[in-house]
UniProtKB/Swiss-Prot annotation:
One Gene Ontology term from the biological process aspect of the record: neuropeptide signaling pathway
Alphabetically ordered keywords of this record: Amidation, Neuropeptide, Secreted
Secreted found in the keyword field: yes
Organism superkingdom: Eukaryota
Residue positions where Leucine amide is found in the record: 8
Record has Secreted as a keyword: yes
Protein name per Swiss-Prot or TrEMBL: Cydiastatin-6
UniProt-annotated location(s): Secreted
Protein family per UniProt: Belongs to the allatostatin family.
Assigned GO CC terms: extracellular region
Cysteines paired by S-S bonds: none
Signal peptide: none
Principal subcellular localisation of the protein: secreted
Organism of derivation: Cydia pomonella (Codling moth)
């Protein structure tokens, strides 16, 4: 689970 998944 990526921390920087702002809508990716």
């Amino acid at each position: 689970l990526p921390l920087y998944n702002f809508g990716l």
